[in-house]
Amino acid sequence: MFEGRDELAITQEDIKRALGKPSVEWAMLIYLRRCVLCHACTAGCVAEQKSPPGIVYRPVYEEEMGVYPNVKRRFTPRPCLQCDDPPCVEACPHKGEGKATWKSKQGISAGVVMINYQECIGCGRCVIACPYKARNLDAGDFYTEETPKVQEYETAPSWEYSRKWVRQKSHIPYGTARKCHFCYHRLKNGMVPMCVSTCIARANYFGDLKDKDSLISKVMQANKVKVLQGVRGKGEVKVKYEALKGKSPKEISKMVGYPGHNPVFADSSKTKPRVYYILP
């Protein structure tokens, strides 16, 4: 399957080939047996996106299962799953292509749930609606704000959604919903998502599922893959919408909390995720 070549090099070739096609279907596959909880993907993502406190697009959770003495641990990366039927988009009062958020189905961004920071009103409904807790609101914090001067690396430009953003107090993307976007700005330039390129164990596969010759397609065909189930029901979401009124971005993010222990994997999910898993 790999022909003695590095998987990362093959993935980059797959991405460049996909960019020459009229439409793509981006997806990610995570091989849980390979994950060693090094957090290289998380650190790489934070550095790439200039992420502030409270915003982590690529968390990796250490999850314990079973009852002593039959206890097992699993390391589970949990980015935005880029659902084909995303509850976060459905919950947005300003949804639609080019508006606050939408599921892209065409062009280079096909397969990615997009956010337009300039249109997002920061209401928090999408944050609460996501059953995977993959979204958070930018509360405007800085790691070095209590020092004499906010350090330059925290206000350095980022290129999310292929636009230049300089993060400052009370300026976009402050107050907006934020999440993983498969490093769309890197994809447009034929580059591999940062979490994929920084993984020391090569636990991630990424590419175009429409391309049956792509590495991700071949690995998925050769293995039994699963998707992650959500952790909340619609009833709880509706109740929490009312509780959002008057809340600050930081308060809303605290309402989201931890995505839950003992994640449930299944053959399919109602949200139709674009991130797949090979279980240990």
List PLM regions with ranges.
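Non-ligating segments of multi-cofactor redox enzymes
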Residues: M1-P280
